[in-house]
């Protein structure tokens, strides 16, 4: 078997195992929606809710909104804006996390129907603006009165921010019947999560993934929401992108997902009975990072005294999570010594390559030794070309005499695939790489592609001229040629396509990938080139003994 065929076989085997890995990861570790089972269905959304969106006519609502006032609040981590119209939170920006325009990331966007990040259907009963009261630096009240079925109610929304800089807002809903002798005619209401975390243009699509996914966590399971799915007593429900999310938690809540105007929303049912309302919602709005999310698993770690909320389960974990955890720790150690995440990726790559060097050494040495047998192998192929059985016997005899395993170069490569996938997942999703600069003016954000020129529009498939993909392609091509142990002139046309096609193919695949991933790839290629020189010297010394 020729060397090019062996390499091609290794590529096919690699692709096969990549496919198997993706299937396993998709089946066991992706967050798919469960089927709507009897256990999960606990209510009928339209039947149980008697307050709809038509309580106030459109013109009246528009006039009310036009006369409302905005209330600006600044905390250690948020820029928040409230409106006296419905007492809504209409803007929530993260002070410490900037977008590509170097502005605070917006977590709330009010849509054309004036729906905010979240809203309460009780708002539809109000016919007056809310009054505002600043209780203290962290607590803000919005209050109004309204009439329903001939009875008068006092309606209060109380927002409380953390005094410890946590990405959590406590929202308390109070509804009191002003006539204490009367029972309430409002037996339930909806809390609707309809978040729209800031998305970027095509240029930054890989930074934010430009999509929202709804999720719910219940019975120790994380699932994506879908139209018609209802869940009893989940720990939380929320929406998220690649790096940010909004999660809502409340005791004894029931949730149903429903499609409205092509938008999937999460409806939280709150049954009241004939009593006054006093409900508390905890709303996490911030980075999708366990360092922030896990603070709410122990009451002594957060200012709200929350425990076992399990917000951290919203962070997707792959099949190779157990490998990614030590890798992340190593990156963090390097960053603590040299505060540059780009260098941390390079050092991590070198450490990983050193650790798996015995495998790669065996693979490259087997390939190098096998290439030395090419003249003898060709003689056997010519001599027994009409006798396949004898050909295989003689080839096997040659391998045994020379002490060479023809598959010795394949299996070590396959064993390295889990490490590659783990590194890819870590570099591609690690929150701290977002906005992290490596080389200012060139690689300003490791979570997106590098750029030396931005077109302002799409040219073919691209929006930017990038340098790292070209460096990656050249270094991979050099690495492939050096590893082949075959002169360029001796390659046939198909072999040349094989050798040059892979680097070019990866160039197009990885062109818009995060620069942190390309730094890993380039470092790997350079390490492989240096490693191959060492292996060639080692093989040469062995043959001279």
UniProtKB/Swiss-Prot annotation:
Family of the protein in this entry: Belongs to the OXA1/ALB3/YidC family. Type 1 subfamily.
Superkingdom classification of source: Bacteria
Example GO biological process: protein transport
NCBIfam families from the UniProt entry: PRK01318.2-5 (NF002358), yidC_oxa1_cterm (TIGR03592)
This protein's GO CC annotations: plasma membrane
Membrane topology type: Multi-pass membrane protein
Transmembrane segments: 10-30, 319-339, 341-361, 407-427, 467-487, 502-522
Subcellular location: Cell inner membrane
Gene, per the UniProt record: yidC
Molecular function as annotated in GO: membrane insertase activity
Protein name, as recorded: Membrane protein insertase YidC
HAMAP family associated with the record: YidC_type1 (MF_01810)
SUBUNIT field: Interacts with the Sec translocase complex via SecD. Specifically interacts with transmembrane segments of nascent integral membrane proteins during membrane integration.
Protein purpose: Required for the insertion and/or proper folding and/or complex formation of integral membrane proteins into the membrane. Involved in integration of membrane proteins that insert both dependently and independently of the Sec translocase complex, as well as at least some lipoproteins. Aids folding of multispanning membrane proteins.
Keywords assigned: Cell inner membrane, Cell membrane, Chaperone, Membrane, Protein transport, Transmembrane, Transmembrane helix, Transport
Main localization (coarse): membrane
């Amino acid at each position: 078997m020729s060397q090019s065929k062996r390499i091609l076989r290794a590529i096919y085997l690699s692709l096969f195992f990549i496919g198997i890995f993706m299937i396993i990861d998709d089946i066991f570790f992706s967050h798919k929606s469960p089927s709507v089972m009897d256990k999960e269905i606990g209510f009928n959304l339209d039947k149980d809710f008697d307050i709809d969106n038509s309580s106030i006519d459109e013109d009246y609502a528009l006039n009310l909104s036009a006369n409302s006032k905005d209330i600006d609040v600044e905390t250690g981590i948020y820029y928040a804006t409230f409106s006296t119209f419905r007492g809504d939170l209409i803007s929530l920006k993260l002070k410490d996390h900037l977008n590509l325009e170097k502005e605070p990331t917006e977590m709330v966007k009010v849509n054309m129907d004036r729906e905010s990040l979240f809203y309460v259907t009780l708002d539809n009963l109000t016919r007056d603006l809310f009054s505002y009261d600043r209780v203290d630096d962290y607590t803000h009240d919005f209050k109004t009165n309204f009439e329903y079925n001939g009875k008068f109610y006092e309606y209060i929304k109380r927002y409380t921010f953390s005094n410890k800089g946590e990405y959590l807002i406590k929202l308390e809903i109070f509804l009191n019947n002003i006539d204490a002798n009367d029972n309430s005619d409002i037996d339930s209401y909806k809390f609707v999560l309809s978040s729209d975390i800031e998305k970027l243009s095509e240029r930054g699509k890989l930074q934010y993934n430009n999509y929202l996914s709804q999720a719910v966590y219940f019975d120790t399971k994380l699932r994506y929401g879908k139209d018609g799915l209802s869940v009893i007593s989940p720990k939380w429900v929320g929406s998220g992108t690649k790096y940010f999310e909004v999660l809502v938690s409340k005791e004894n809540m029931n949730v149903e997902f429903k499609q409205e105007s092509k938008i999937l929303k999460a409806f939280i049912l709150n049954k009241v009975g004939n009593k006054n309302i006093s409900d508390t919602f905890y709303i996490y709005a911030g980075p999708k990072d366990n360092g922030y999310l896990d603070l709410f698993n122990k009451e002594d770690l957060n200012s709200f005294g929350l425990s076992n909320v399990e917000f951290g389960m919203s962070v997707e974990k792959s099949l190779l999570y157990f490998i990614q955890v030590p890798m992340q720790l190593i990156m963090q150690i390097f960053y603590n010594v040299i505060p540059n995440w780009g260098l941390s990726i390079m050092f991590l790559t070198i450490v990983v390559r050193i650790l798996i060097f015995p495998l790669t050494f065996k693979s490259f040495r087997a390939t190098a030794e096998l290439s030395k047998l090419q003249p003898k192998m060709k003689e056997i192929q010519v001599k027994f070309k009409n006798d396949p059985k004898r050909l295989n016997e003689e080839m096997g005899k040659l391998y045994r005499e020379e002490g060479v395993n023809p598959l010795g170069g394949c299996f070590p490569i396959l064993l390295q695939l889990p490490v590659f996938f783990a590194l890819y997942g870590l570099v591609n999703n690690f929150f701290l790489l977002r906005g992290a600069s490596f080389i200012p003016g060139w690689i300003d954000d490791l979570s997106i592609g590098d750029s030396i020129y931005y077109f302002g529009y799409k040219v073919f498939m691209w929006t930017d001229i990038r340098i790292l993909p070209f460096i990656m392609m050249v270094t991979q091509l050099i690495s492939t040629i050096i590893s082949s142990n075959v002169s360029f002139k001796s390659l046939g046309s198909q072999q040349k396509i094989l050798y040059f096609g892979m680097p070019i193919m990866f160039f197009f695949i990885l062109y818009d990938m995060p620069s942190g991933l390309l730094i890993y790839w380039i470092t790997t290629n350079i390490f492989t080139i240096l490693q191959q020189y060492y292996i060639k010297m080692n093989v040469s010394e062995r043959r001279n003994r």
